[in-house]
Amino acid sequence: MELPGALQLGELAAAFASVPVFPLFDAAYFIVSVLYLKYEPGAVEMSRKSPFASWLCAMLHCFGSYILADLLLGESPIHYFSNNSSVILATAVWYLIFFCPMNLFYKCVSFLPVKLIFVAMKEVVRVRKIAAGVHHAHHQYHHGWFIMMATGWVKGSGVALMSNFEQLLRGVWRPETNEILHMSFPTKASLYGTVLFTLQQTHWLPVSEANLVFFFTMFMIVCKVFMTATHSHASPFAPVEGFICPVFFGSVSSGHTSHHNQHGHSHEASYQPPPPVKSKEELNEGTRKRKAKKAE
């Protein structure tokens, strides 16, 4: 009974991997991506003042992963924009979400049950893009493991890794939102997923690509749908990382504490703390006193 079950599972995975993503899954991907753009502060006002800048930001949200991957592989960063069907579909989604009368389209797609369906469909596209990125890099660099991982990672992370550049287009600069320093769950999951696909592509992971695509897609769908439904930002990897990271990379607090304890006394005698910086109110008070003395 185990062999027929395995055959049925393999056939299911193969059938799932052969399902085309255009236009339905791509449309869902664009809808969720542009929705997240509209959630950004000032995005609606920007769409009224500068529709072209808003459209550029929307295209980055939809095609940022392709731009980064092409840059990594030395190809034209605007190569994907030759796909007229995808660009027109993404443009139509952007226009409907931002400019549909009475916000009807936005209200429909942001309705939570409908949005959860689109979120699940977006994860299907994300995993396909990771697998395609690793496969594309393997075709050019057969033994370049890190190139495969980097290409698959940027294919799955999308505009998250370009968030600071996208913010500049919106006239916002928030360097503390650097995605590499503070990885969100999709970025981190894309990184772990591209490692698995790289191992599979180099025959170190004894599983077919169709099965890996199927199971990793199911994992991403379950996690993202649950996090979206519960409005949670907690990473499912946090418990494992909390156990492994201190073992391999040490504790941040303990390492820095011991370092300061060893060198703190030697610097204490020679180091003179700078005078406290005066606040704006104190500076204004001093200015008023000097003016009063001059008047006297």
Swiss-Prot record:
Entry keywords, A to Z: Ion channel, Ion transport, Membrane, Nucleus, Potassium, Potassium channel, Potassium transport, Sarcoplasmic reticulum, Transmembrane, Transmembrane helix, Transport
Catalyses which reaction(s): K(+)(in) = K(+)(out)
Organism name: Gallus gallus
Residues the record lists as binding a 1,2-diacyl-sn-glycero-3-phospho-(1D-myo-inositol-4,5-bisphosphate): K122, R126
Keyword Signal: no
Membrane topology of the entry: Multi-pass membrane protein
Organism lineage string: Eukaryota, Metazoa, Chordata, Craniata, Vertebrata
Regions that span the bilayer: 20-37, 52-73, 86-103, 108-126, 145-162, 184-201, 210-230
This protein's name: Trimeric intracellular cation channel type A
All ranges on the Lumenal side of the membrane: 1-19, 74-85, 127-144, 202-209
Regions of compositional bias (Basic and acidic residues) in chain numbering: 278-287
Subunit structure, interactors included: Homotrimer; conformation seems to be controled by binding to diacylglycerol (DAG).
